[in-house]
Amino acid sequence: MEQVLSSPQGCSEWEVNGKTEWESDQNPLGFLLVDKENSSVADPTNEIFQENAINLDDLFWASQTYSWENGLDCVYPEWKAQPPPSQDLKGDGNSGISQLVEGDLICFNSRSASPSLADRPVQDNNLYDHAEQVEVTATSSTLNVCTGELGINAPTLHTDKTLLQDTHLMLEESHLTNCEFSCNSGVENESQNFLSHGTRNILESEGLFAVSPVEVSCVDTNSNPKPTIVCQTPPLASEHIYLSSSALPCEPVFPMTCTKPHVPPYHAGSATLPMDEVEMMLPKLQGGEGESSKPSANNRTLEPQRLDANTDTTHLSVCPLGESDISPEHCEEMLHELSTKCTVEMVEEEVNKKSVSSNTTNTAFSKPKTELCEELSGCTLGVLLETVSGDVKEEAASDSRTDHVFPETQTDLAPVALIDSQAEDPSTESLPRKNGQEESKSALPVSTPEHNALFELSSGNVVLPEDHSQSTFSAQTQALSEVDHDGDLTPDGMLTDNIVCEAVTSIDSVILSLTDSFELPKLSDCDLSSHDFESHALTLEIQNNVTCVQTGSVDNNPEEMSTPFTCTDNQLTVTGGLAGLDLTETTSQSGEASGEGEAGLPVLPTHQEDFHQLTPSEINLAQEQQVSSVVPSSPPSHRDVFPCGASLDGEAYLTLMENNPDTLKHAEMTLDLCKASDALPTKSLQIAPVDLIHVPIVSATAPRSEEQSALRAVFQALDQDGDGFVHIEEFIEFAKAYGAEQVKDLTRFLDPSGLGVISFEDFHRGISAISNEESAYSECETFTDEDTTALVHPELHEDVETDSGIENTLTDGDDRNSPSSFPASFQNFLQSEALEFFCTHCHKQISRLEDLSTRLQLLEMNRHLQQSNNLDVMGDLTQDILDLADRDITDKVLLLEKRVCELEKDSLESEEQHARLRQENLTLVHRANALEEQLKEQELRTEEDLLAQTRKHRDALNKLQRERDLEIENLQARLHQLDEENSELRSCVPCLRANIERLEEEKRKLQDEADDITQRLNEESESRRKMSDKLSHERHTNQKEKECTQGLIEDLRKQLEHLQLFKLETEARRGRSSSNGLQEYNTHMRENELEQEIRRLKQDNRSLKEQNDELNGQIINLSIQGAKSLFTESLSESLAAEINNVSRAELMEAIHKQEEINFRLQDYIDRIIVAIMESNPSILEVK
């Protein structure tokens, strides 16, 4: 994660994307999270901080825990004395591995991208246009570094008249006598350096003097015919680059084991640098105070007494010195010769590439394996450099892995500097390796303040021979490399797939910078075992032997290549020339600091000192970043490590400020880091706030393709439906969710046509427009009191911090997503008071800037005077330097005037805003008073209503009480009445029981009678049934007889009719009259028919009567059965039980009902008997 969600004050977050700028209150894009893997991150702030940022609260806790638990005397690891190095040359790179030395190894993980400030874009401020984009890495430990298998190119070295004007490699103090480069007896005589295309190395030594790189240029003649690379760091022609100082004696050094790199074949077209130029560039500052008299490191050992005496420091070890055989006149002649050869060749394709800073660009050197021995034979001095051959568009950084690991601290081979000069197409990714070639990355920075040292670097051979290199244990240097910034510790001695460096020493040995007024007398008589000196004394010795580390970077992975952090055991260190010395301490303060020790050196504060009472001293931005980036889980011996980064001189910084007005945005982080430093314990190297005028902020401009890829990742994250457009509503919700305040302005930039959707082109164009617009935001918020704290008197420091605290109160609330514990009115009051105090301090900036302008002029004059006194070899350039300084001072004054005008405008705006806020506050006060009056009136009305309701409630309660009493009285009277009735009913119970017994006796008698009658009835019914059966049988028999008789009668009638007819016929034949006979016959026939009809009707009547009788009998049977069921025993028992259980009234009612039923039954029986008597009396007869 290269960009982290940043708060407005930026106290606890880093922002290290190659193009973005430090976010503030004015930046509405602070909520966007751009991931290097082209993915948008929308995680919560806590998760983001855990993975990609530094938690200042944990840092503050971790930085104090060890000191508080262990007291003032913190124990740090001791380094055991090691035997003198062997003088045997090893033929192979790994032949010396068997000679192990007891010590600690720190394993570094360089695969992850750590947050850094080294990749910020600034405009190119050097004398050339559009220098190559490069990667800045730093190390403070002596590392013997061997490059991987890189392509070889032979560049042409050039320089300019401004070779030393832009670098100002000057030793300000007269006690820093010379810079001698020692020679090794085993060094071969031929060595050459080659400047590669597309890479760079900045020499820098943490805790030592920052060497401003010398500007040179080289032409790539082999790998890419495109451009000539303009570089500002000349090849250092020294195996042991040593800035001698009489302050401290030298300590013994020890050999380091390095691996021998595999070198590809040498290109025939490569050009070499003449050996005489190497010798001509060897400087010798002053012959009166040479360090050649110091004993050789091969004949000395570490003093165990010092190791035992004080555990807070580790003894300083330096490389053996050698006499320089190059005279100052010869060096001066060489400088003139080089100045006439300077050329500037740039290709149009490289125009879009930006230089990282105005004083630092890349230098690289390459050497083929086949030509190595021949060139080493002529080499007397060399410096080990390792370069990164990667995509310059990806800022030339590679995620490296260790393929060959050196054993702890012993070596038998001298480092060999092989630098790849292959230029890569900026539009492509890093080139893959071929034939097992490996790409290695490391750096050996050597930095010296331009105000304090002159360091001439040779343009000749820079390749080291394969010989014993001397490693040192230094209390003032730290081995830095790339490591995971998430806080994971790698155990000592454990080998990973990354760079392995020797362990670092205690933090108490961090070196402070010198002020322009410090005097550095010789300290040969100082007590090095004293606590103040050993823990806090400034050491001015520089050594650059390095441990050979060969790393391999991952192919085709530019996302993992830009890691500008270097670290030792979780000690994050910003590299790449981001920070330099802050020489803004006043003369009186310098004098006070000089008087604290015998050697006139500044002494760091102890636990008992209050940070707010300290005299502001020099500080660089890298140290503050180190304070804010130390992982809390790191061991106490590796906490609070501050690197000294490469610094910009005054002229370069002024040019930087003119060409890049956005630099103050980067300076805002310095303010926040100063605030964070207040929370650290004094034992953990308390530091004074930084003077932004002298804080160099250098960054690299990200390539356009990387910017587009990062923006596309954000756009794809916002484009949820994947249609290539982002709706305005979704973007507004996303912006509000991450605290963006100027959402309307964002939508105005991103959707100028008002279509409601945002395409990627509009998104990219809008973000660019917003970035350009933000470059001119008010400096009243960035250039706060902490910007010029170094100019403020110590007693005013507390007020300045109070102002900063008020600013934090104004801005920290919502951005940290923490609910406020104060009321809104109190917060508004704090904001108004803080704004008034803040604007008051804005006016103070004007006077301070004027003092600052005068001070800058004095500093420049003093620096050039020091240069003229210490640089006899540069006599012919002194006038040019002074003229350049005058022009630069004039430019600075103009810049300061411009800033004063801007501050005045901002002050006027602040006054207007303050007046408006006062008016609003007055309106709010009136409104609050009116509301208070309304509240009082409402309270009075409420009290009156409450009293009225209380009275009503009391009256209602009294009424209810009276009603309850009356109801109780009524109920008592009713109860008394019921008791009387109950007593009466109880007295009636015996009588009723006697009546019940009498009635039961009568009931039993009736029951018996009914039983007798029923029995008789049953008998009669049985006899009747028998008789009915017999009757029906007889009737059936009679019917058959009747039918037979009827048939017989019919036959007889027929016969009679035949006879009558026959008679009539016979009479007719006899002559009688037939009419009378015929009439008689007809009459007789009619009578017969009528008789038959009468008989039939009678028979039918008889059958109907029989049916009627049967039905009557059935009715009588049913009636008898019903009456019998009424008088059964079960019914009588249930009736008695019911009589016992019911009341008197119910009993009387039941008796009346029963009597009615009996009456009805009696009437019904009587009617049945009457009907029987009328219809068939024979049924009732007793037989």
Curated annotation (Swiss-Prot):
Bias type Basic and acidic residues, positions: 431-441
Residue stretches making up the FIP-RBD domain: 1121-1183
Entry membrane topology: Peripheral membrane protein
Gene Ontology MF terms in the entry: calcium ion binding; molecular adaptor activity; protein homodimerization activity; small GTPase binding
Coiled-coil region: 902-1121
GO biological process annotation, one example: endocytic recycling
Binding site for Ca(2+) 1: D719, D721, D723, E730
Record keywords, A-Z: Calcium, Cell cycle, Cell division, Coiled coil, Cytoplasm, Cytoskeleton, Endosome, Golgi apparatus, Membrane, Metal-binding, Repeat, Transport
SUPFAM superfamilies assigned: EF-hand, Eferin C-derminal domain-like
Localization per Swiss-Prot or TrEMBL: Recycling endosome membrane; Cytoplasm, Cytoskeleton, Microtubule organizing center, Centrosome; Cleavage furrow; Midbody
Annotated region (ARF-binding domain (ABD)), positions in chain: 911-1015
Residues annotated for Ca(2+) 2 binding in this entry: D751, S753, D762
Matches recorded under PANTHER family: RAB11 FAMILY-INTERACTING PROTEIN 3, RAB11-FAMILY INTERACTING PROTEIN
Function, as annotated: Downstream effector molecule for Rab11 GTPase which acts as a regulator of endocytic trafficking, cytokinesis and intracellular ciliogenesis by participating in membrane delivery.
Identification of the protein by name: Rab11 family-interacting protein 3
Annotated organism of origin: Danio rerio (Zebrafish)
